[in-house]
């Protein structure tokens, strides 16, 4: 185990080097991610219409006025600072004072979660998304210090920045419950119930305050917020099932199947660990804890009629995997089992790390390809007569073969690098006037619109990568790639 000895000896140097490479991979594509293009080309913020008014205020402050400003890479760097602050808070509060290699690695999934890449690639949104996560984590520790008003204020502000981030509050509460299980064997049920009740009460008060003081009176409803604000209890089970389906993409592919086996092994070890610690009451804790993580996966989509399951809303995932690894590290923290522990830690963290590097390369390849195709598309659109007031509809997506190969290996990459729903924003950069586009509740509605009308439209332009249809009122740009609808 000479190699392991060297890793332990130089663990801090390795930690810094590997994380710097991960950060470089994240920042190096230098892309306009999703609706970054919309904000950059349109010159306005408009997060308030998505129930995030504090985000507008933040950019009015750092941008020194209402006019749009692009401070990249500063927002992403600050977002990374917030993210690593969460990591070190977890190290401080949930490990022993002695810093071991295991402790350093256990909480890495909080940073390297593949789903979190969808938050970090935003050159504008990332700063307040991760700030909201940090505030949600800090709120829990304020509750522990019995500073309830401060905790409510932190959650209130987090909600004003990015509502899905508050699942970090729930996840951190579950870690503290885990700590209680370790340190208290007497009256554990009473203590566990009391803590849970306090955490929930603070959480509920913050949400109610935000709803009645901000959402109900100050939100300027737009198409997105109006569409994604209708709720019903009947949506609970279907939305939970849909969230699990979306997250299960992480287990697809050849490497993903190995990760799936390890994941179930971690869940089993977590159950064994809890039963060892608190007898059969551990089974109840196991069920409640994992159900809580599942509900955190659904997050703000829990009761929505039209949920929006974007990867950026799955903030819980890194916390959940770290929770499983923490219990496993306690159970296998013996000389006879440590080699198995190191194997598990290495595979899980390298799997996440590899996805991040592959996403970075996919983003670069896709950006180069889309830039060249977009120039041709813009030229074709300028040649179309009498369509200054047309509405645009983009359908499908074309991925270069390099990106296809990476997606075959790691299917989770596909939705991270997908940009089909945001081509209209990329297009705006080439037109001096605001383009109009058809709005749809979801992709199914868009595809139905296409199927219903395509035979009534004239083919205006044909290209290897796309077809342009038109009828004088609408322009449909259909991309022909394997990622497309047809």
Language-model regions, residue ranges each:
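Transmembrane catalytic cores of multi-pass membrane glycosyltransferases
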Residues: 22-85, 105, 123, 156, ...
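Transmembrane alpha-helical segments of multi-pass membrane glycosylation machinery
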Residues: 75-88, 110-111, 133-136, 322
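Membrane-interface transmembrane helices that cradle and orient dolichyl/undecaprenyl
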Residues: 136-150, 183
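Aromatic- and kink-enriched transmembrane "portal" helix at the membrane-lumen/periplasm boundary
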Residues: 101-135, 160
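Membrane-helix interface segments
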Residues: 68-73, 97-103, 145-150, 188, ...
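Signature aromatic-anchored transmembrane alpha helix within multi-pass, membrane-resident enzymes
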Residues: 331-355
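Membrane-interface helix caps and helix-loop-helix hairpins in membrane proteins
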Residues: 116-126, 304-309, 359-362
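Intrinsically disordered, polar/acidic, low-complexity terminal segments
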Residues: 2-59, 63-83, 92-107, 253, ...
């Amino acid at each position: 185990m000479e190699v392991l000895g060297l890793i332990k000896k130089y663990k801090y140097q390795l930690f810094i080097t590997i994380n710097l490479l991960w950060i470089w991979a994240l920042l190096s594509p230098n892309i306009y991610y999703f609706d970054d293009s919309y904000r950059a080309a349109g010159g306005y913020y408009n997060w308030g219409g998505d129930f995030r008014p504090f985000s507008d205020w933040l950019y009015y402050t750092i941008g020194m006025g209402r006019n749009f400003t692009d401070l990249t890479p500063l927002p992403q760097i600050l977002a990374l600072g917030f993210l690593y602050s969460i990591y070190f808070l977890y190290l401080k509060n949930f490990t022993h004072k002695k810093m071991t290699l295991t402790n350093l690695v256990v909480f890495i999934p909080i940073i390297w979660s593949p789903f979190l890449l969808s938050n970090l690639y935003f050159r504008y949104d990332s700063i307040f998304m991760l700030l909201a996560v940090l505030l949600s984590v800090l709120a829990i520790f304020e509750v522990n210090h019995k500073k309830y008003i401060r905790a409510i204020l932190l959650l209130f502000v987090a909600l004003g920045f990015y509502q899905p981030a508050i699942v970090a509050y729930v996840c951190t509460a579950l870690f503290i419950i885990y700590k209680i299980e370790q340190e208290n064997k007497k009256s554990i049920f009473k203590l566990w119930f009391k803590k849970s009740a306090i955490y929930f009460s603070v959480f509920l008060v913050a949400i109610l305050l935000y709803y009645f003081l901000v959402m109900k009176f100050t939100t300027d409803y737009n198409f997105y917020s109006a569409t994604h604000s209708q709720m019903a209890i009947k949506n609970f089970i279907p939305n939970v099932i849909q969230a699990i389906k979306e997250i299960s993409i992480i287990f697809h592919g050849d490497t993903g199947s190995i990760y799936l086996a390890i994941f179930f092994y971690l869940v089993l070890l977590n159950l064994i660990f809890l039963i060892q610690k608190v007898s059969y009451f551990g089974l109840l804790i196991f069920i409640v804890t994992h159900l809580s993580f599942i509900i955190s996966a659904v997050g703000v989509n829990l009761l929505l009629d039209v949920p929006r399951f974007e990867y950026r809303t799955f903030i819980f995932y890194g916390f959940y995997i770290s929770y499983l690894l923490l219990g496993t590290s306690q159970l296998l923290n013996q000389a006879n089992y440590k080699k198995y522990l190191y194997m598990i830690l290495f595979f899980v963290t390298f799997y996440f790390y590899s996805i991040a590097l592959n996403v970075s390369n996919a983003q670069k390849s896709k950006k180069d390809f889309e830039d060249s195709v977009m120039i041709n598309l813009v030229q074709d659109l300028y040649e179309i007569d009498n369509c200054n007031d047309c509405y645009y509809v983009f359908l499908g997506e074309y991925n270069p073969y390099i990106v296809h190969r990476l997606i075959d290996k790691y299917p989770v990459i596909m939705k991270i690098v997908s940009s089909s729903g945001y081509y209209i924003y990329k297009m705006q950069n080439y037109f001096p006037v605001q383009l109009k586009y058809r709005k749809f509740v979801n992709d199914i509605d868009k595809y139905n619109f296409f199927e219903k009308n395509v035979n009534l439209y004239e083919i205006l332009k044909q290209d290897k990568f796309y077809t342009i249809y038109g009828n004088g009122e609408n322009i449909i740009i259909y991309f022909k790639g394997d990622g497309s609808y047809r």
